[in-house]
Amino acid sequence: MITLTHYLVLGALLFGISAMGIFMNRKNVLVLLMSIELMLLAVNFNFIAFSQHLGDTAGQIFVFFVLTVAAAESAIGLAIMVLVYRNRQTINVADLDELKG
């Protein structure tokens, strides 16, 4: 039988993988965005696991709000990334150190 501990371990593994993705690859904006999204999904997975374990639907409802914000974040982040790529021909974070007013 799968218990709450199994779900929490899986959520922690997903969170750890996404944290490794952020810390090991700080150069590519696309990989950073994907790692942040994976981190949010790991947190949502834990919300759903606790919600199911406690028999309360509040955690599941909260997940819908988090997914909505994550979708908006992804859309805005990808739009900014496309604009930066059109102007600079790169999505390398190290090359994005100049601000123009």
Curated annotation (Swiss-Prot):
Transmembrane segments: 4-24, 30-50, 61-81
Domain of life, per lineage: Bacteria
EC number(s) on file: 7.1.1.-
Membrane topology, from the record: Multi-pass membrane protein
Biological process (GO), any one: ATP synthesis coupled electron transport
Enzyme class, spelled out: translocase
Main subcellular location of this protein, as a coarse class: membrane
Keywords in alphabetical order: Cell inner membrane, Cell membrane, Membrane, NAD, Quinone, Translocase, Transmembrane, Transmembrane helix, Transport, Ubiquinone
Gene Ontology CC: one annotated term: plasma membrane
GO molecular function: NADH:ubiquinone reductase (non-electrogenic) activity; quinone binding
Catalysis performed (reactions): a quinone + NADH + 5 H(+)(in) = a quinol + NAD(+) + 4 H(+)(out)
Compartments where found: Cell inner membrane
Function of the protein: NDH-1 shuttles electrons from NADH, via FMN and iron-sulfur (Fe-S) centers, to quinones in the respiratory chain. The immediate electron acceptor for the enzyme in this species is believed to be ubiquinone. Couples the redox reaction to proton translocation (for every two electrons transferred, four hydrogen ions are translocated across the cytoplasmic membrane), and thus conserves the redox energy in a proton gradient.
Family per similarity comment: Belongs to the complex I subunit 4L family.
Assembly notes: NDH-1 is composed of 14 different subunits. Subunits NuoA, H, J, K, L, M, N constitute the membrane sector of the complex.
Protein name, per record: NADH-quinone oxidoreductase subunit K
Protein's organism: Neisseria gonorrhoeae (strain ATCC 700825 / FA 1090)
Gene: nuoK
